[in-house]
């Protein structure tokens, strides 16, 4: 079972509803603004339709944070838009969980959004069924790495369209960003999966932006002491660099004033 499936909590389940989440409509506007930066003349009607359909399909579902579930696919779509992907991929990102977690079918998607979007969502749904966990801790490192490599190859082979992998990476990235709401055991399992499967795939595809953030978030849960030590060192270097730049600017300004 994947962490995505565990995230779906229905309205009648006992959860503490968070009061500190972003309004879905505000997230949607952020998505549209992001898309229009690189596709200013693009017709957004299909994206708007996908948002309405996904909102209705997920309306009684919540994440473990207490947020409405629609927050997740919207964030996935924003990550994809930040990578400047095409409109069909953005739409599939918004709809990527509706077949697995709601009553909607692939046929429904094909009828409403066309073959391209339906095939992308179907590809993501199939990837989510690959069992990524379950390695025996007593096996050698070489054996575990071979198993991880086999999983990576299976993952890539099953995705007939590279955009399916992009959606899955965006899906995993947002789940990693919100991993604090999972149990400690789930945090370790998901972070390990991310480190062993998703980070190498992102590296192979040359998506350094996602790879780096996935690595950082994995380290945060697998080796928290090392992670926070690194964060502290980076912050210290930034402060030193900022002080140097500010001093340099002040020197230049003073020289200009003296020369003027």
Regions found by a protein language model. Name each.
Residues 1-260:
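Active-site helical microenvironments for divalent-metal-assisted chemistry
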């Amino acid at each position: 079972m994947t962490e995505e499936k565990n995230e779906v909590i229905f309205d009648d389940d006992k959860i503490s509803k968070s009061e500190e989440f972003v309004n879905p409509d505000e997230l949607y506007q952020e998505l549209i603004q992001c898309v229009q930066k690189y596709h200013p003349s693009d017709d957004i009607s299909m994206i708007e339709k996908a948002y309405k359909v996904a909102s209705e399909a997920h309306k009684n579902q919540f994440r473990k944070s207490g947020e409405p579930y629609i927050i997740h696919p919207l964030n996935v779509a924003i990550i994809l838009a930040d990578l400047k992907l095409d409109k069909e991929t953005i739409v599939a990102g918004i709809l990527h969980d509706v077949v697995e977690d709601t009553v909607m079918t692939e046929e429904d998607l094909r009828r409403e959004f066309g073959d391209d979007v339906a095939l992308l969502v179907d590809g993501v749904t199939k990837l989510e069924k690959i069992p990524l966990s379950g390695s025996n801790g007593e096996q050698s490192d070489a054996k575990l790495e071979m198993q991880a490599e086999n999983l990576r190859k299976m993952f890539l082979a099953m995705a007939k369209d590279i955009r399916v992998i992009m959606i899955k990476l965006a899906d995993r990235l947002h789940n990693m960003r919100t991993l604090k709401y999972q149990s400690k055991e789930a945090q370790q399992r998901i972070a390990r999966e991310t480190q062993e499967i998703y980070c190498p795939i992102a590296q192979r595809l040359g998506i350094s932006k996602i790879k780096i953030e996935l690595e950082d978030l994995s380290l945060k849960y697998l080796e928290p002491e090392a992670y926070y030590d690194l964060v502290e060192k980076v912050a210290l270097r930034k402060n030193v660099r900022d002080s140097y730049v500010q001093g340099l600017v002040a020197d230049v300004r003073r020289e200009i004033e003296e020369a003027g």
